[in-house]
UniProtKB/Swiss-Prot annotation:
GO biological process, one term: lipid catabolic process
Domain of life: Eukaryota
Alphabetical UniProt keywords: Coiled coil, Glycoprotein, Hydrolase, Lipid degradation, Lipid metabolism, Plant defense, Signal, Storage protein, Vacuole
Function in brief: Probable lipolytic acyl hydrolase (LAH), an activity which is thought to be involved in the response of tubers to pathogens.
Active site: 77 (nucleophile), 216 (proton acceptor)
Name assigned to this protein: Patatin group J-1
Pfam families (UniProt xref): Patatin
Span of the annotated motif GXGXXG: 36-41
SUPFAM superfamilies associated with the record: FabD/lysophospholipase-like (SSF52151)
Species this chain originates from: Solanum tuberosum (Potato)
Length: 387
């Protein structure tokens, strides 16, 4: 009798734990963050194609899209462009680009975006005209509020000297941020040295006009928008009734996938003190930008990893990054076909590499694990909505 009673208690405990697990999964906030890096966006593009393919297989749905699974998708520079591609609706209110269309986009348009050199010593390397043209063609008149999920795209206003973050959830307080997606995408990609800054205005319903003078979002997030995306997700969890059980900064109920565009094992380029001693201001400016981007990426990953580990939620965070780029693959504007093919190979090879030295799990296996969580959560939410 005692054995039977103990068995029943055990069953109740298992059911309670299972119910709690599913409830936790259902209310988990899912976040996708994509780094900047110019043409190196091909690397996360390759990873996204794999992830979306896994979701389609698991849900037996060829029309499944990443925006169906992530509560927040954020990006800066080329990552902001990818964010727009997979969240901007087409005429059927579905993402205008599937993940398997990202890499072909770079192959088709990259050589033109990074080919219209101004030829000026003083001024940006490229005029940005083709970039704006293709953004207007692809994104049309779509504005932030129409995005299919919450977005977080960063830029920096050189007139106000403040970062500008474009999100859906902030429009009630700041309606002037409901800009056209092509203006936002050009702004977040307008890297100093490479493209001209972007000026545009928005008009609110009460007739107010707001002016923007924007440059690359990497100035605000230093290339890695993961912390920004996580901050937006935290605010979403606090304000959206669907996540009422989530406490502030409860990373146990956060699922974060952060995609890098690759870096060298130390920095994009390495130097010696003897070399640097001969540099002038311009050479230092270029080197500092490269060093800052690389160092910031490492520190952001270190900080997020530490926080998730402290909350015993390390499996809820995955940083996918290639840290051993060499040669032309380190360049953000080498859009030659040969280099783009190399970048595809980098992404495909990365999938087979271990996530860390201490873990035998490969990125491919980790992404499949994430895909399973995303798929199960979507099904749980769909079941709840049907009641």
């Amino acid at each position: 009798m005692a054995t039977t009673k103990s068995f029943l208690i055990l069953i109740v405990m298992i059911l309670a734990t299972t119910s709690s697990t599913f409830a936790s999964l259902e209310e988990m906030v899912t976040v996708l963050s994509i780094d900047g890096g110019g043409i190196k966006g091909i690397i996360p593009g390759t990873i996204l194609e794999f992830l979306e393919g896994q979701l389609q297989k698991m849900d037996n749905n060829a029309d499944a899209r990443l925006a169906d699974y992530f509560d927040v998708i954020g990006g800066t520079s080329t990552g902001g462009l990818l964010t727009a591609m997979i969240t901007t609706p087409n005429e059927n209110n579905r993402p205008f680009a599937a993940a398997n269309e990202i890499v072909p986009f770079y192959f088709e348009h990259g050589p033109h975006i990074f080919n219209s050199s101004t030829g000026q010593f003083f001024g940006p390397k490229y005029d940005g005209k083709y970039l704006m043209q293709v953004l207007q063609e692809k994104l049309g008149e779509t504005r932030v509020h129409q995005a299919l999920t919450e977005v977080a795209i960063s830029s920096f206003d050189i007139k106000t000297n403040k970062p500008v973050i474009f999100t859906k959830s902030n429009l009630a307080k700041s309606p002037e941020l409901d800009a056209k997606m092509y203006d936002i995408c050009y702004s977040t990609a307008a890297a100093p040295i490479y493209f001209p800054p972007h000026h545009f205005v928005t008009h609110t319903s009460n007739g107010a006009t707001y002016e923007f003078n924007l440059v690359d979002g990497g100035v605000a997030t230093v290339g890695d928008p993961a912390l920004l995306s996580l901050s937006v997700a935290t605010r979403l969890a606090q304000e959206d009734p669907a996540f009422s059980s989530i406490k502030s900064l409860d990373y146990k109920q956060m699922l974060l996938l952060s995609l890098g565009t690759g870096t060298n094992s130390e920095f994009d380029k390495t130097y010696t003190a003897e070399e640097a001693a001969k540099w002038g201001p311009l050479r230092w400016m270029l080197a500092i930008q490269q060093m800052t981007n690389a160092a910031s990426s490492y520190m952001t990953d270190y900080y997020i990893s530490t926080v998730f580990q402290a909350r015993h939620s390390q499996n809820n965070y995955l940083r996918v990054q290639e840290n051993a780029l060499t040669g032309t693959t380190t360049e953000m504007d080498d859009a030659s076909e040969a280099n783009m093919e190399l970048l595809v190979q980098v992404g495909e090879t990365l999938l087979k590499k271990p996530v860390s030295k201490d873990s035998p799990e490969t990125y491919e296996e980790a992404l499949k694990r994430f895909a399973k969580l995303l798929s199960n959560r979507k099904k749980l939410r769909a079941n709840k909505a049907s009641y």
